A protein has these predicted regions:
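S-adenosyl-L-methionine-dependent methyltransferase catalytic core, i.e., the SAM/SAH-binding region
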Residues: 1-282
Length: 282
């Protein structure tokens, strides 16, 4: 089941839709954002991307819509393949879809006992269980520290390393039992969310794909085109903000001879747009 899209009106309005323009929905999912964009198109075209094959079931029967079952990091190649050199607007709603979280067998949530899979693209090989059972102590430390921002990372990794010498860690219930001694009692859900986030990001190469997508979007958009990105955690947010403000991922502001900041994007909204109280309650 796919839930109501986040910031639906704000994000689609942010694209400043030209009824005859070319638009990209890089995270099609349940198709909520795409359906709203299609309502505002006349003779334009919308290309929807989603690497998750489950999204195929939601593709609208609309001649103006083209579905691409691949990662959004290759957006320019597919834009050209569809017959277009430039796009008028690009929308990306990052992170995991509600469907992926709620499907127990996908392994994205610690609410269910399931195989630790966590692949957004079911055709890819690397699973979370591969990471837990084959990664070195150094690499496990890196992903939980950098992608999960876990405080007691050494204790966490030590528990995993010890457990896997006796038995492979393959399911959520097993994993939760292994790491239980280092989970803070008062912050259990937050801690587990950070741990699962770290594994998911590594499995799917999310941050690398995000950087590739932003560079591709910069080159694919026509002058005056719009890019709308919805982020959910500080790692995504930092990458997007740095790139849009400075033109690079380090956030280093470079200026030309006249003192003008060298970047290709002009910020339309200076302040962050957040969901309304009504939307949060839904």
């Amino acid at each position: 089941m796919y839930h109501v899209p986040v910031l639906l009106e704000e994000s689609v309005s942010g694209l400043n839709i030209d009824p005859d323009g070319v638009y990209l929905d890089l995270t099609f999912g349940g198709g909520g954002h795409s359906r709203e964009i299609l309502k505002r198109l006349k003779d334009g075209c919308l290309i929807g991307f989603d690497q998750d094959s489950d999204a195929l079931a939601n593709v609208p029967d609309d001649s103006r819509f083209i579905f691409v079952n691949h990662n959004f990091r290759y957006l320019r190649n597919f834009l050209r393949y569809c017959g277009y050199d430039e796009a008028d607007g690009i929308l990306a709603d990052l992170g995991v879809s509600s469907h992926e979280f709620d499907e127990a067998g996908r392994g994205f949530s610690f609410r269910f006992d399931a195989e630790l899979d966590m692949r957004m693209n079911q055709r890819s090989r690397l699973k979370a269980t591969d990471i837990l059972n084959t990664y070195s102590e150094e690499d496990l430390t890196r992903i939980f520290r950098n992608y999960g921002e876990v405080d007691n990372v050494r204790r966490l990794v030590d528990l995993i390393m010890r457990a896997r010498t006796e038995k492979m860690i393959t399911r959520s219930e097993e994993f939760l039992q292994v790491i239980a001694p280092c989970v803070p009692k008062q912050k259990e859900k937050k801690y587990l969310a950070q741990v699962y986030q770290a594994l998911r990001i590594e499995v799917n190469g999310e941050l690398e794909a995000l950087e590739d997508m932003l560079k591709e979007a910069e080159r694919a958009l026509r002058p005056g085109g719009r890019l709308v990105v919805i982020t959910y955690h500080s790692l995504e947010d930092r990458i997007v903000k740095n790139f849009l403000k400075s033109g690079n991922f380090e956030g280093k502001v470079e200026k030309d001879f006249y003192g003008h900041v060298k970047r290709n994007f002009e910020l339309v909204n200076r302040k962050v747009i957040v969901p309304s109280e009504e939307e949060i309650e839904r």
